[in-house]
Swiss-Prot record:
GO terms for cellular component: cytosol; glycine cleavage complex. The glycine cleavage system is composed of four proteins: P, T, L and H. PANTHER family: GLYCINE DEHYDROGENASE (DECARBOXYLATING), GLYCINE DEHYDROGENASE, DECARBOXYLATING. InterPro entries: GcvP (IPR003437), GDC-P_C (IPR049316), GDC-P_N (IPR049315), GDC_P (IPR020581), PyrdxlP-dep_Trfase (IPR015424), PyrdxlP-dep_Trfase_major (IPR015421), PyrdxlP-dep_Trfase_small (IPR015422). The gene is gcvP. This is Glycine dehydrogenase (decarboxylating). The lineage of its organism: Bacteria, Pseudomonadati, Pseudomonadota, Gammaproteobacteria, Cellvibrionales. The glycine cleavage system catalyzes the degradation of glycine. The P protein binds the alpha-amino group of glycine through its pyridoxal phosphate cofactor; CO(2) is released and the remaining methylamine moiety is then transferred to the lipoamide cofactor of the H protein. Belongs to the GcvP family. Its cofactor is pyridoxal 5'-phosphate. It catalyses: N(6)-[(R)-lipoyl]-L-lysyl-[glycine-cleavage complex H protein] + glycine + H(+) = N(6)-[(R)-S(8)-aminomethyldihydrolipoyl]-L-lysyl-[glycine-cleavage complex H protein] + CO2.
């Protein structure tokens, strides 16, 4: 008798689990057999300490398939209301050119790449970022710019810290913030200043700056209520006391307004959102950061520079990396690791697509419509607070404020209440004549009858930007902004750049501690839904019921995965999550009256962001040693605890450790810290080895940040966006970050503000929601198990060729492993960099180099890679070891072999003469699979020293592009 298939199986609700996890059943069996294991359960029992095991993810709903998850989320999205928003405050409706939407934002060749630490296979993104820097340099009038920041408010806070670093002659500890800055910027400045130990004074900068002795000051240009004013008097007042003047500028206004740099500003920050990036209820967006060249070594963030490769060809790279957290740790200029690469390149492609004339036309249209609206409002008898404006009008309405606001709401329009007597209206790229008519109708209480078009002549004649503030000449002058105005040319340019880079759509990216797993297409689809993209972050919350549901459900999911009691979604990067967690700890101890606690214990193996974050909250970093097995040295930890006792605020520890092992004594470590009343911060960078097996909130953690762009499938975007929410135990929950504009449930404004938007980069939270919903408890656990299986399989295959530096007590690793290359360097002169570059010839991105131990490679394959891909990588690594053995034996010279000459380009392969002691095929196609498909690095090894000594961070002449 035959049996039918159950409906549960036919609906295939677990379908996605098998699509996300790489190895199939046969491959899994083969991998286990190779390691002499009976089952994955046996591997997990031998790897993960029993003392921390649990199954908290059982609280998750059962998995659903892709279609079901998309339908559920579409239903949630439908509860958001898409009003026309004229709120402004740094967020504006914009139009994403379809060629950029489809070929960048929706393209895995762009969104699945990693930060360009290996520049030879990242020349496309690097060119896009260099163009971005050029755009910011020209618009701001600064000498240099970095390759993006997280948002405008945190960029302003970073600028404040930078001002303190460089104003060495100035002994003041006071920073002045203009009250006309956006309120979210002021809130982030207040939070940062309080933990840096700065005094922050907020006032009217034109009247009060010269009453203070300050090391720096910031103003908004135009002001948050719309006024445009000459910056020169403010600049002069700041410079008279050796203080720096920071300007937070609106990027579209800079097309028509005189640049802050031309007026003497020292640092210029702002948001690129209105250059073709959806509002997304707060993000993600790229911020910009322009500065004077003399401050280049004090600036935060990535900087892209021009160098040369070994053939003398122009090549791009990340410059001056010694400023950054992964090298300088607590002495770094900033704790920022991820920036906003995907959004930065989208914004510059927007500028390149429109060109200087196009963006000028957009800015002039917005400005002209604003003048027409002003003419109509004044004709109705309304009074404007300012006569000088770009796109924002401040209308004095006195006791009519609430009535007009409500009338606008009834018409599907969002205005901004300013103080108690005014409403502001910020126009945007999407504003039409019909919108002007609607706004005039709202303000006339339905009595408006004037023909809107008739306002045009008078508006065109009106000069409302002061002569001293008008830009002379085009805003964008480099030829790169005049090359790609047709869709055909832009499409091909984007493809040319994409083809220069290795992303996950090419091959595994085995970067340790980075978790480059599958970013499934179904997870990405909702990101571009207008129901999520078109909401202003400060719109009334009743318009964002869908987002509220999304936040609540995702918080519950993350609580189930971590064992924590509360989740804050505000931090928009892992670095900001670390900062938010440490701020919560600080606030907690202030509440207890234990302000003497200022010691942060950090193991030597920690991520560089950990000490950099600790110093941002005025904690003193004390390093705890690691033992020969890679574990935290318990004896040294006990000694440090005895020495510092009740002055200890926190221990920051990554688990599993960055050495790639599950430390057996983690609960004892947590207990020891708790014994002196301190808090345990468990860095969530390696959560991909824990979800479904062990929860940090259950085995001793008080707070963790979660890299949603690692464990929970938000793509890395070539270096951003990311999201770094934090989970906390109940005693820390009252101290989570609030927001001054949009109240966050169960938080207080006085707790401080971490990011510009209340829920960070809200629109990409849909990705993690989709991932967890489609995986369910069963799938989340399986993902973790296969991450551990894949890593151990690689370690097993490579251990006879490279020493595995650290293993757990039973001889297994966690989800990543360290290959010790120091003996090889001693015997052959071959370095970890040589192997990293040689891997490019095999079509692979290198593992993480020299972290957490110098002279090593850290490999993390993730659960998404099949056995075939793991074998391909292992075959490449084994072949490289064989090549190195020829150097060891003297068959190949130390200074002329496939490793030290790597990577090999098409130019190398086509050289008319070949004088190297190995063949062209050995150079470029060292394994058979490369005969069928080959990814060519577009430049040879780049000269890092030359690039830093001859620092060029703007676009070369157009001739240098055509010469190539």
């Amino acid at each position: 008798m035959s049996h039918g298939t159950s409906l549960d199986e036919l609906f295939n609700s677990r379908d996605f689990i098998g699509r996300h996890i790489g190895p199939n059943a046969d491959q899994t069996r083969a991998m286990l057999d190779a390691m002499g294991l009976d089952s994955i359960d046996q591997l997990i029992d031998l790897t993960v300490p029993a003392s921390i095991r649990g199954e908290e993810t059982r609280a998750l709903a059962a998995p659903v398939n892709e279609q079901q998850a998309l339908a559920e989320l579409k239903n949630i999205a439908g509860n958001n209301q898409r009003f026309k928003s004229y709120i402004g405050m740094g967020y504006h409706p914009t139009y994403v050119p379809p060629v950029i939407l489809r070929n960048v934002l929706e393209n895995p060749g762009w969104y699945t790449a990693y930060t360009p630490y290996q520049p030879e296979i990242a020349q496309g993104r690097l060119e896009g970022l260099l163009n971005f820097q050029q755009m910011i340099i020209e618009l701001t009038g600064m000498d240099m710019a970095n390759a993006s920041m997280l948002d405008e408010a945190t960029a302003a806070a970073e600028a404040m810290a930078m001002a303190k670093r460089v104003a060495r002659k100035n002994k003041s500890n006071t920073f002045f913030a203009d009250k006309h800055c956006h309120p979210q910027t002021l809130a982030v400045l207040q939070t940062r200043a309080s933990h840096f130990g700065f005094e922050l004074v907020i006032g009217d900068i034109t009247q009060d700056l010269n009453k203070q002795e300050v090391f720096g000051a910031i103003t908004q240009y135009p002001g948050t209520s719309g006024e445009v004013k000459d910056l020169r008097p403010i600049v002069n007042q700041a410079h008279e006391q050796d203080a720096l003047l920071i300007v937070a500028a609106d990027i579209l206004s800079l097309v028509l307004l005189e640049s802050p740099g031309a007026m003497g500003a020292d640092i210029v920050v702002g948001s690129n959102q209105r250059f073709g990036i959806p509002m997304g209820f707060g993000g993600p967006h790229a911020a910009f950061f322009g500065f004077r060249e003399k401050y280049k070594r004090a600036t935060p963030g990535r900087i892209i520079g021009v160098s040369v490769d070994t053939r003398g060809k122009r090549a791009l790279r990340m410059a001056m990396q010694t400023r950054e957290q992964h090298i300088r740790r607590e002495k770094a200029n900033s704790n920022i690791c991820t920036s906003q690469v995907l959004l930065a390149v989208m914004s510059v492609f927007y500028a390149m697509y429109h060109g200087s004339a196009g963006v000028t036309r957009i800015a002039q249209r917005v400005h002209t419509l604003t003048k027409m609206l002003a003419q109509g409002l004044t004709a109705q008898g309304h009074k404007l607070a300012f006569d000088n404006y770009f796109d924002t009008l401040c209308v004095i309405v006195n006791d009519q404020q609430q009535g007009l606001f409500d009338r606008a709401q009834q018409a599907g329009v969002n205005l901004r209440k300013l103080d108690k007597n005014a409403l502001t209206i910020s126009l945007n790229e999407c504003t039409s004549l019909e919108d002007i008519h609607q706004l005039l109708d709202i303000f006339s209480l339905g009595k408006h009858s004037q023909d809107v078009k008739s306002l045009e002549t008078k508006a065109l004649a009106a000069e409302v930007i002061p002569a001293s503030c008008r830009r002379e000449g085009p805003a964008l002058n480099h030829p790169v902004f005049e090359q790609y105005h047709s869709e055909t040319e832009m499409l091909r340019y984007l493809k040319r750049l994409e083809s220069k880079d290795i992303a996950l759509n090419h091959a595994m990216i085995p970067l340790g501690s980075c978790t480059m797993k599958l970013n499934a297409t179904a997870e990405m689809i909702p990101v571009t839904w207008p129901e999520f993209g078109e909401l202003h972050p400060f719109a009334p919350m009743e318009q964002a019921a869908g987002y509220s549901t999304l936040f609540t459900q995702l918080q519950d999911m993350l609580k189930a995965c971590t064992g924590y009691d509360a989740i804050s979604l505000q931090p928009n990067a892992g670095s900001q999550g670390e900062y938010a967690g440490l701020v919560a700890i600080r606030k907690y101890f202030e509440h207890l009256g234990q302000t003497e606690r200022n010691i942060c214990l950090i193991p030597a193996s920690a991520h560089g962001t950990n000490p950099a974050s600790a110093q941002m909250v005025e904690m003193k970093v004390v390093v705890v040693a690691c033992d020969n097995l890679g574990n935290v040295d318990l004896n040294d930890l006990k000694a440090k605890v005895a020495q510092y006792g009740e002055t200890i605020a926190a221990l920051m520890v990554t688990y599993p450790s960055t050495h790639g092992v599950f430390e057996e004594e983690i609960t004892a470590i947590c207990d020891l810290i708790h014994s002196v009343g301190a808090q345990v911060y468990i860095d969530g960078a390696n959560m991909n080895a824990l979800v479904g097996l062990a929860a940090p909130g259950k085995f001793g953690g008080d707070v963790s940040h979660l890299n949603l762009h690692k464990t929970f499938c938000i793509p890395h975007g070539g270096g951003g966006p990311g999201m770094g929410p934090i989970g906390v135990k109940s005693h820390l929950a009252p101290f989570l970050a609030g927001h001054p504009v949009q109240p966050v449930p169960n938080t207080l404004v006085e707790n401080g503000t971490i990011s510009a938007a209340p829920w960070g980069s809200a629109s990409i939270l849909t990705i993690s929601w989709m991932y967890i919903r489609m995986m369910g408890a069963e799938g989340m656990k399986r993902a973790t198990e296969f991450a551990i299986l894949n890593a151990n399989y690689i370690a097993h295959r490579l251990q006879d060729h490279y020493p595995i530096l650290y293993k757990g007590k039973n001889g297994y690793i966690a989800h990543e492993c360290l290959l010790d290359l120091r003996p090889l360097k001693e015997s052959s002169g071959i370095t970890e960099e040589d192997i990293a570059k040689r891997l490019m010839d095999f079509g692979f991105h290198a593992p993480t180099m020299s972290f957490p131990v110098a002279g090593t490679l850290m490999i993390e394959p993730t659960e998404s890679e099949s056995q075939a891909e793991l074998d391909r990588f292992c075959d490449a690594m084994i072949k490289i070891r064989q090549e190195a053995s020829l150097v060891e034996s003297g068959e190949l010279p130390r200074d002329n072999n496939p490793l030290v000459n790597a990577p090999h380009t098409l130019d190398d392969a086509l050289d008319e003469t070949w004088t190297r002691p190995y063949t062209r095929d050995e150079a470029t196609r060292p394994l058979p699979y490369l005969h069928a498909h080959k990814i060519w690095p577009t430049v040879n090894r780049i000269d890092n020293v030359y690039g830093d000594r001859n620092l060029i961070c703007s676009c070369p002449s157009i001739e240098s592009y055509t010469e190539e």
